[in-house]
């Protein structure tokens, strides 16, 4: 495996249960404080990479060989952030980000911390749903990953506009400071892996088309957070969307804003689907429950020779759109399904959206199911 495999989520790892900050600090007998923040502590960083690396090294089953298939993996970007910590010359990943990115760009309200934001009265209250009930708090440590490259940045609209403007300027800040080479920007945006037809993933950025224009961006979600940045290099504009509520369609909102500005149709238009049907063999082999170590799952069921995807949000028709390819039409876009098959033709997993889900095979329904399957 190489670094570029992790940069484009093709290391071959299934989604695994999240290793979180609060449980790790409890086991270590330490806590966050303004005097000694976790994001700068060497012992916490080393414990985090130890836990993640040991778990990844223990995996015996994979989505495919490195570089073969896209499957979003926060663990991979966590490992990347620790590589930066070890080899950048800085004591922590947080310090590197501050010195090399935030300060040169003038992003004075952005940081990777936890407690400082929870105590900040000018920080957003986070609205999240747990066990069917809404909660409102400033718990910026809630479900936070132990390695900060997996999604720890807290920012503002103004700061993120400075960040996305750097891409539009070819790697240069508003003040003229070079943050990244023009070649580096281009490498980040080049397509490396297919997410679904018409959508690819580069080095930390997703790429799609809006007519003849290119759209490049990325989203993020946590309890109480829905976010999206979106760039159109040809038009020289960018959209930043931040919301302090979970499960908001941030990507759809950002793209609608971009389309409106560029004079494109704003509303989502469902694609014209080919006239295909699932064969009896395909229906038999696809039916079953697919479960991710992150806790998400879906079930493919058959009714009257048609397939449906059942999730917590309801049941939707799984359209056949090609050889062993399926599509679910959602409110704001399509979710593509691509099964992973063995040499014998058996379905043992499926990429659904951005994740690859192992198919359950009569094993115990626990959080380690991804590591128990055989491919």
Where are these regions (language model features)?
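Short, well-ordered beta-strand elements
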Residues: 217, 228-245, 348-351
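Residue-level recognition of short loop/turn positions
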Residues: 131, 234-235, 344
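Short acidic (Asp/Glu) and glycine-rich catalytic loops that position anionic groups and cofactors
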Residues: 140-143, 233-237, 266-267
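Histidine- and/or cysteine-centered catalytic micro-motif in compact active-site loops
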Residues: 219, 242-246, 295, 303
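Short, surface-exposed loop or secondary-structure junction motifs
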Residues: 1-223, 227
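A short acidic/glycine-rich loop-to-helix N-cap element
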Residues: 248-252
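Peripheral terminal and inter-domain segments
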Residues: 213, 255-375
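A short acidic/small-residue loop/turn micro-motif
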Residues: 246-247, 355
């Amino acid at each position: 495996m190489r670094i570029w495999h992790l940069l484009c989520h093709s290391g071959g790892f299934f989604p695994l249960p999240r290793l979180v900050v609060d449980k790790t600090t409890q086991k270590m007998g330490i806590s966050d404080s303004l005097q000694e923040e976790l994001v700068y502590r060497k012992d916490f960083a080393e414990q985090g990479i130890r836990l993640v690396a040991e778990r990844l090294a223990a995996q015996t089953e994979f989505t495919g060989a490195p570089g073969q298939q896209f499957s979003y993996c926060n663990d991979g970007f966590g490992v990347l952030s620790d590589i930066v910590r070890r080899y950048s010359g800085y004591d922590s990943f947080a310090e590197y980000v501050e010195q090399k990115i935030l300060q040169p760009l003038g992003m004075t309200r952005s940081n990777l911390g936890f407690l400082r934001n929870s105590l900040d009265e000018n920080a957003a209250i986070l609205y999240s749903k747990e066990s069917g009930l809404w909660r409102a708090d400033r718990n910026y440590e809630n479900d936070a990953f132990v390695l900060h490259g997996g999604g720890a940045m807290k920012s503002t609209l103004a700061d993120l506009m400075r960040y996305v403007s750097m891409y539009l300027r070819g790697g240069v800040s508003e003040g003229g400071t070079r943050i990244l080479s023009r070649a580096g920007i281009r490498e980040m945006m080049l397509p490396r892996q297919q997410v679904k037809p018409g959508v690819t993933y580069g080095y930390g950025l997703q790429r799609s088309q809006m007519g003849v224009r290119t759209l490049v961006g990325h989203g993020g979600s946590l309890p109480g957070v829905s976010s999206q940045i979106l760039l159109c290099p040809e038009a020289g504009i960018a959209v930043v969307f931040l919301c302090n509520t979970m499960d908001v369609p941030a990507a759809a909102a950002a793209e609608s804003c971009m389309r409106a500005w560029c004079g494109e149709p704003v509303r989502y238009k469902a694609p014209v689907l080919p006239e295909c049907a699932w064969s009896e063999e395909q229906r038999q082999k696809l039916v079953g429950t697919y479960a991710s170590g992150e806790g998400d799952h879906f079930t493919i069921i058959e009714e009257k020779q048609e397939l449906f995807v059942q999730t917590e949000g309801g049941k939707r028709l799984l359209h056949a759109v090609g050889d062993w390819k399926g599509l679910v039409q959602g409110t704001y876009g399509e979710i593509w399904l691509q099964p992973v098959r063995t040499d014998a033709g058996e379905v043992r997993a499926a990429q659904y959206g951005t994740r690859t889900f192992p198919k359950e095979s009569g094993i115990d329904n626990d959080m380690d199911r991804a590591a128990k399957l055989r491919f």
